[in-house]
């Protein structure tokens, strides 16, 4: 198959946000695109599938401006996509990071300083202890705590967004194959091939399909297709609870932003990483923990364990007095696909010339979805910039995994 960069035939493996946004951008630039998803869309087992993912820029400290620029660009694209969706999926109640220290070199201070120096944005406020008590009385604030409040921040209804985006790209001509698991990838000098097992065929035989290029955006299942990369990624179990209460009126968007509580010790290391959302469409409040969970197989049972359930209940009752008599209506687990340094992988697979990898969301990838699609497509068309270089593999996969993020504060995706 002769490679014509003006119009290529490209397969995208995985219909999470990395895969669908890439398919959207490729189709918009005139390429022929097919998306293969091992389950339904949205896949209940995928990292992208949940009720909510935070949109925030106050978590990247002074690492560099790559992430801040990308999330601000992504926010504009989310709004553009939303205008084409049937349902509203983007909400901006603000974001709030609460911590116990605000001095130079502490994560909270450096996040604030970086954004002020680079954005000069009036939406970003520092709330002292008294202001925190007054502004958010539904939260029990400790006497040593202070916060960054960013009115710009918010969240995406992630599972709904994935569904809406799949409908949109399908209407534009992208071929979508649900319940079609890719079992293998091959390359020749002229083409790339997928071996696909489809439930719809009621057969154990594999179908071989030919493409110019393949984009592997299979998240936690990257190892199954590209073991030399996937074996370097850790898949961790992350847990959350959903809460009903007679006091839900105190937790609506107008009264409570997306929040996280990130106390640090004397070594500037995070002690705990709880976060949550205001009242969601489903009528519940979501509370979760962003500390890296246990490493699991992506196909394993994800039921929250008793220890998490107790810790979440204790945290909720301590920090949200109005929820003391509330009911936990459900609990669930999801997965993060973590790189050693928590930065994404957007690069050609090692030893491959026609297989590209978009993976390693590391618990903060969803918000960047629209920008990821553009970055991937730019590389496939040989139009690279600074951001593309930031996510190359290089020697990153040989590093030791971080227990906690070096991006600044933990960055809730849910």
List the model feature ranges, each with a label.
Residues 28-48:
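Glycine-rich FAD pyrophosphate-binding loop
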Residues 80, 101-178, 184-190, 338:
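Flavin (FAD/FMN) cofactor-binding and adjacent substrate-gating region
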Residues 6-8, 202-213:
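Core beta-strand elements of the Rossmann-like FAD/NAD(P) dinucleotide-binding domain
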Residues 8-35:
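N-terminal Rossmann-like FAD-binding beta1-loop-alpha1 element of flavoenzymes
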Residues 52-135, 273:
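Dinucleotide-binding Rossmann-like beta1-alpha1 core, especially the glycine-rich loop
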Residues 24-29, 56, 86-94, 209, ...:
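Active-site substrate-recognition segment that forms the wall
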Residues 184-208:
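Conserved beta-strand-loop-beta-strand element in the redox core of flavoprotein oxidoreductases
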Residues 315-414:
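C-terminal catalytic lobe of FAD-dependent flavoproteins
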